[in-house]
Swiss-Prot record:
GO terms for cellular component: cytoplasm
Site location (Stabilizes the phosphate intermediate): N78
Record protein name field: GPN-loop GTPase 2
InterPro entries: Gpn, Gpn2, P-loop_NTPase
Length: 310
């Protein structure tokens, strides 16, 4: 490393399924961080990303191109992308040479959207593990489209994917419900927003699914999935609207607390600022009501909501 550069670096590994808003998140978060005075370096780790809206400090496309891999090896998009990540894993010296001059920056890693990379394939986890050896402290920021909350079956699937990702990636982890301004675009929520963000008693979700003739036949399967999720008791969500600065601030406070940035000495924070960052990461539950009033249309209570209050 360069002599006077700080040895420890911090950042976010932005992961999530395709279309969840990872690239938009990197753009919005980088602008917010620069407004706070942090030096930011956005790193594109997705070889399929084209026409990036942000200024890219490092682009994996300079090392390996998805189109070239697909043509040369006759692979499809998914297989080609997996090969690209394995190629990056085998050439981490290239990545380190790109990152070393950026010490002192706060990193945002825009990762590929293929779910298998975060649930069972080893390349991305190995890359993150090696970054930890370089004294780069990352928080995994997992984005999930908030409109999945309107479909109980999809929400259970999201919970399973989020849990599998948390266990596989092996990083401090934050789950986000992205695009909060569009949460009811495809339907109404069956319960209050805090039911989904805090992942409360999922038996109510099973009862709601039982009213559907199709899912009634899969009740035992859903019960086992719910039991697995509740046994681990790891998954929760923070609502995010990337256009809302207060929403971004809540996310950043949680991320900073997870990777230890708010307790670092690099910015010489005052004690008051440190306490604000440390404690602020825990108040998203109390702010959920305000978020619900802001983004969800008012409606009469459903039977499920009344049951939740008993």
């Amino acid at each position: 490393m360069a002599g006077a550069a700080p040895t420890t670096a911090f950042g976010q590994a932005v992961i999530g399924p395709p279309g969840s808003g990872k690239t938009t998140y990197c753009l919005g978060m980088s602008e917010f961080l620069r407004a706070l005075g942090r030096r930011v370096a956005v790193v594109n780790l997705d070889p399929a990303n084209e026409g990036l809206p942000y200024e890219c400090a490092v682009d994996v496309g300079e090392l390996v191109g998805l189109g070239d891999v697909m043509d040369a090896l006759r692979l499809g998009p998914n297989g080609g992308l997996l090969y690209c990540m394995e190629y990056l894993e085998a050439n981490l010296d290239w990545l380190r040479a790109k990152l070393d001059p950026l010490r002192g920056h706060y990193f945002l890693f825009d990762c590929p959207g293929q779910v298998e990379l975060c649930t069972h394939h080893g390349a991305l986890r190995s890359i993150f593990s090696q970054m930890a050896q370089w004294d780069l402290r990352l928080t995994a920021v997992h984005l999930v489209d908030s409109h999945y909350c309107t479909d109980p079956a999809k929400f259970i699937s999201v919970l399973c994917t989020s849990l599998a990702t948390m266990l596989h990636v092996e990083l401090p982890h934050i789950n986000l419900l992205s695009k909060m301004d569009l949460i009811e675009h495809y339907g109404k929520l069956a319960f209050n927003l805090d039911y989904y963000t805090e992942v409360l008693d999922l038996s109510y979700l099973l009862d709601h699914l039982a009213s559907d003739p199709f899912f009634r036949h899969y009740r035992q399967l859903n019960e086992k999935l719910v039991q697995l999720i509740e046994d681990y008791s790891l998954v929760s969500f923070i609502p995010l609207n990337i256009q809302d600065k207060e929403s971004i601030q809540r996310v950043l406070q949680a991320v900073d607390k997870a990777n230890g940035y708010c307790f670092g000495a690099q910015e010489q924070r005052s004690l008051e600022a440190m306490m604000s960052a440390a404690m602020g990461a825990d108040f998203h539950f109390s702010s959920t009501l305000g978020i619900q009033e802001k983004y969800l249309a008012p409606s009469n209570q459903s039977v499920e909501q009344e049951a939740m209050q008993l």
